[in-house]
């Protein structure tokens, strides 16, 4: 008797469970959050890349980012990992409050708590930071091998998008934490 029907898919070939927090993140975004964290960074990335392309400066922009981003993103990775660790290992009145505050956001048709929402958001930021660092390393590796304008343009769009997405996501997370503890009486 088979309990689970055997299926062949990408998950059988390569580990893909790491995509679930990213899927959960995008599934929980409200329209205004999507515009703030996804659409706006895409628009800015495309416009910025177009300006650099017109000025024939895409390669210098990529090199400039490659010079500063690995260190900055590594620090952000450490900071985000620390925030996740603190969130997951802390207990007390404030954490219990976060766990009790339900949001209108749903995963698997169940409302998630603000605690779960923050965990999803921080996990997404961590994954995006790691992906950005890998993309920068890949771009630097390929720089000496392949010189192609449209690849450079795509890389610049992706890097600008991820930088803005990460920073705006962190900003929204900080805002969520702030307002979850903001006392209504202090207004």
Locations of regions flagged by a protein language model:
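Juxtamembrane "helix exit" motif at the C-terminal ends of alpha-helical transmembrane segments
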Residues: 44-60, 90, 134-146
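Alpha-helical transmembrane segments of integral membrane proteins
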Residues: 32-33, 37-41, 100-187
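Membrane-spanning helices that line or support transport/gating and their immediate boundary helices
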Residues: 83, 90, 94, 173-181
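Hydrophobic alpha-helical transmembrane segments
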Residues: 9-25, 66-77, 100-114
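Hydrophobic alpha-helical membrane-embedded segments
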Residues: 71-92
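Membrane-helix interface/capping segments
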Residues: 59, 85-106
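N-terminal juxtamembrane cytosolic/stromal segments of multi-pass membrane proteins
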Residues: 1-40, 44-46
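Long, highly hydrophobic alpha-helical transmembrane signal-anchor segments
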Residues: 31-74, 155
């Amino acid at each position: 008797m088979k309990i689970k029907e055997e299926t062949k898919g990408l998950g059988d070939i390569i580990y893909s469970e790491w995509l679930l927090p990213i899927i959960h993140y995008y599934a929980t975004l409200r329209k205004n959050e999507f515009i703030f964290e996804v659409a706006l960074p895409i628009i800015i990335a495309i416009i910025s890349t177009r300006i650099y392309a017109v000025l024939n400066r895409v390669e210098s922009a990529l090199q400039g980012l490659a010079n500063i981003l690995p260190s900055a993103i590594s620090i952000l990775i450490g900071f985000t990992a620390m925030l996740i660790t603190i969130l997951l290992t802390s207990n007390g009145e404030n954490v219990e409050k976060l766990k009790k505050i339900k949001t209108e956001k749903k995963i698997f048709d169940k409302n998630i708590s603000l605690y779960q929402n923050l965990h999803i958001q921080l996990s997404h930021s961590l994954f995006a930071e790691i992906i950005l660092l890998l993309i920068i390393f890949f771009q630097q590796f390929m720089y000496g091998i392949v010189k192609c304008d449209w690849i450079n343009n795509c890389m610049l769009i992706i890097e600008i998008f991820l930088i803005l997405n990460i920073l705006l996501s962190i900003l929204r997370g900080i805002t969520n934490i702030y307002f979850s503890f903001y006392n209504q009486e202090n207004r």
